[in-house]
Amino acid sequence: MSRPRIGAAAAITQLEGWAIAPNHKDAIVKTFRFDDFNQAFGFMTRVALMADKLDHHPEWFNVYNRVEVLLTTHDADGVTDLDLTLAKFMDSAA
């Protein structure tokens, strides 16, 4: 069963530094920067453990000290409370 959509516009009002994804139906994006690759990879590891617990996984891209993240709930075809929960966790883990 799909979760109800809250929408990207509503989600970013509750988050710091997140934006509506360009060229995407309903998603939020953020780029995290760290001192080095080790910190970026540590962040990704912490987020991966939480994502597994939530059974909700980000689309992300990593180059050296930068992690670009896109969150959306595919079966809801947009942003849901799962995306908001994972985004808030990412902000606290960064």
From Swiss-Prot:
InterPro entries given in the database record: PCD_sf, Pterin_deHydtase
Lyase found in the keyword field: yes
EC number: 4.2.1.96
Catalytic activity: (4aS,6R)-4a-hydroxy-L-erythro-5,6,7,8-tetrahydrobiopterin = (6R)-L-erythro-6,7-dihydrobiopterin + H2O
Keywords: Lyase
A UniProt-annotated Pfam family: Pterin_4a
GO BP: any one term: tetrahydrobiopterin biosynthetic process
GO molecular function, one term: 4-alpha-hydroxytetrahydrobiopterin dehydratase activity
Enzyme class: lyase
Source superkingdom: Bacteria
Family to which the UniProt record says this protein belongs: Belongs to the pterin-4-alpha-carbinolamine dehydratase family.
PANTHER family (alphabetical): PTERIN-4-ALPHA-CARBINOLAMINE DEHYDRATASE
Family annotation (HAMAP family): Pterin_4_alpha
Annotated protein name in UniProt: Putative pterin-4-alpha-carbinolamine dehydratase
